[in-house]
Amino acid sequence: MNRDMKYIQVVVELLLCCCLYACSPCPESVQPADRLLELYPEYQDVTIPCNVAPLNFLVRNEGVDAVCVSVKGASDSLQINARGNKAVFPLKAWRALLEAEKGHTLEVTVTARTSGRWLRYPSFAWQVVADKLDAYVSYRLIEPGYEVWNALQIRERCIENFEERILADNSQTDGKCMNCHVHGGNSGNLSMFHLRGEGGGTILNRDGKLRKLALKNGQMISAAVYGDFHPDGRYGVFSSNVIIPMFHTESNRRLEVYDTVSDLAVADFDGNRMIVSPLTADSTVLETFPTFSADGKWIYYCSAPAVPLPDSVQQLRYSLCRIAFDANHGTWGDRVDTLWNARLEKGSVCHPKASPDGRYLLYTVADYGTCLLYTSPSPR
């Protein structure tokens, strides 16, 4: 681009900015708000990584038709004015602000116009940390509901700029269900997901090479369901479950989802075999949600004694357990350790995950069961 073209581009951009600013309402005769600020998503008083995309939001207070948002840091600031109730930050200015304010706190003030009156809400904080998150997150896109579904995709999204791409689309697999996608070591070079129905299987990706696997043998009650990769990528640990949805007749309760039977098994992707232990394949015990420790020496999972179902579903409580695993020989340990006892704690553990550095284990505690889609976790 020559100098004349660059000059024209700069002038056009300045004119556009001036027009946008002139068209955007500016607060005047501002009064303090007498009610709490309602945002969606709820971004008030949160800690954010320095590489996150703009925290755009909606002001959900009734009757808002214009907003002004001021973000002030120690050395830089950003302000936007917009019609409607949506606050959208320019990506370039947002990135510059976060880069300048690493390790500092941003003060965010929202002023909104309602019925011709400008109201200023109490400020809240965004703490900017110098640490970066991995740039990509994968998720399953499906219509909300629990009876029927149609379009289904597994997608990847960049948390730095909102860009997305489709990894798998059931419109290309005769409408088959796809679920339980997992990445190993937070890497795109090691991943898998289950393709259900006739001709289905587990689709394994290792360094861009795809394989369809049947992760089931005669000792297992079902094909693989919930799973995790061993750090070396050779093994995966899975539960096999018979999952039952049960609808309530009470108006304030909608749905229960529970396992009638469930066991664990390890898949040896190189040896093309499933490895089962009698300690985690007991018909009197339900085992589910297995995950490897960061060093691969332990398998953490949830375990509950079987109870009559559905009548005793609220007495179904899972403990947090672990068992050793020897990756050199592909063998399970010879004892089970209980780390969090459901009977003593009067709760139920689900979804354990080990931190990559091996220092922490994250899990959720429910009142009972392991499905939190229609029940609330206990405050603990």
Describe each PLM feature range:
Residues P32-E42, D76-A93, E160-K176, N205-A223, ...:
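Multi-bladed beta-propeller domains
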Residues Y21-A22:
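C-terminal motif of bacterial Sec signal peptides marking the signal peptidase cleavage site
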